[in-house]
From Swiss-Prot:
PROSITE patterns: ADH_SHORT. Ca(2+) 1 binds at residues 50, 53. This is 3-oxoacyl-[acyl-carrier-protein] reductase FabG. Pfam families: adh_short_C2. Catalyzes the NADPH-dependent reduction of beta-ketoacyl-ACP substrates to beta-hydroxyacyl-ACP products, the first reductive step in the elongation cycle of fatty acid biosynthesis. Homotetramer. GO terms for cellular component: cytosol. It comes from Escherichia coli (strain K12). It comes from the Bacteria. GO terms for molecular function: 3-oxoacyl-[acyl-carrier-protein] reductase (NADPH) activity; identical protein binding; metal ion binding; NAD binding; NADP binding; oxidoreductase activity, acting on the CH-OH group of donors, NAD or NADP as acceptor.
């Protein structure tokens, strides 16, 4: 998998899965623009990417911010070839206690942003007759999870959105797919007690948590020419926790 000459935009790239994706695409030759919600986060991305790309501040819920970032990318690097929608948040609560803003924040950040970003890069991809759009979903989007009705709805929505868009643009050489992680090793999971960790692992036939690099590898495959005939799919990376 060689991405020489390709421009990749990865949202939410300051740490965790987003950083692993950005570093993996850069290591394989892409120029990577990673985004963060703060200037400090954007600078951190610039620091780790070095000559392989740049960090920019982006509010994925703001159309003006999206257009500004894309203008900067066009001016310095060119049109986006690979879009990785990774930015996301959680606002967990039981439905009976969930406030409207907790619902709306998740839908805007985790779902509507994918619509806006995908639309913003689409014209150039169609003109080139080539493009890759990969969105980071979640196992919760297919199996559900108590206390996450908002998050699960958004992640399920990503799947329907991606399937529909895939049908619209497949004839132009553009693929649209979802990678749905299960439990992934993060700072949060590392802070769990032994009992809490055991409870999670009991749900995973593989007997371990996944790594951010394993998600990045899946994204890199879907972004590659080797995956040119795969579109409208959701690739589940969850150690057997949920099998579709």
């Amino acid at each position: 998998m060689n991405f020489e000459g390709k421009i990749a935009l990865v949202t939410g790239a300051s740490r965790g899965i987003g950083r692993a994706i950005a570093e993996t695409l850069a290591a394989r030759g892409a120029k990577v623009i990673g985004t963060a919600t703060s200037e400090n986060g954007a600078q951190a991305i610039s620091d780790y990417l070095g000559a392989n790309g740049k960090g920019l501040m982006l509010n994925v819920t703001d159309p003006a911010s999206i257009e500004s970032v894309l203008e900067k990318i066009r001016a310095e690097f060119g049109e986006v070839d690979i879009l990785v929608n990774n930015a996301g948040i959680t606002r967990d609560n039981l439905l009976m206690r969930m406030k409207d803003e907790e619902w709306n924040d998740i839908i805007e950040t985790n779902l509507s942003s994918v619509f806006r970003l995908s639309k913003a890069v689409m014209r150039a991809m169609m003109k080139k007759r080539h493009g890759r759009i990969i969105t980071i979903g979640s196992v919760v989007g297919t199996m559900g999870n108590g206390g996450q009705a908002n998050y699960a709805a958004a992640k399920a929505g990503l799947i329907g959105f991606s399937k529909s868009l895939a049908r619209e643009v497949a004839s132009r050489g553009i693929t649209v797919n979802v990678v749905a992680p299960g439990f992934i090793e993060t700072d949060m999971t590392r802070a769990l007690s032994d009992d809490q960790r055991a409870g999670i692992l009991a749900q995973v036939p593989a007997g371990r948590l996944g790594g951010a690099q394993e998600i990045a590898n899946a994204v890199a495959f879907l972004a590659s020419d080797e995956a040119a005939y795969i579109t409208g799919e959701t690739l589940h990376v969850n150690g057997g926790m949920y099998m579709v």
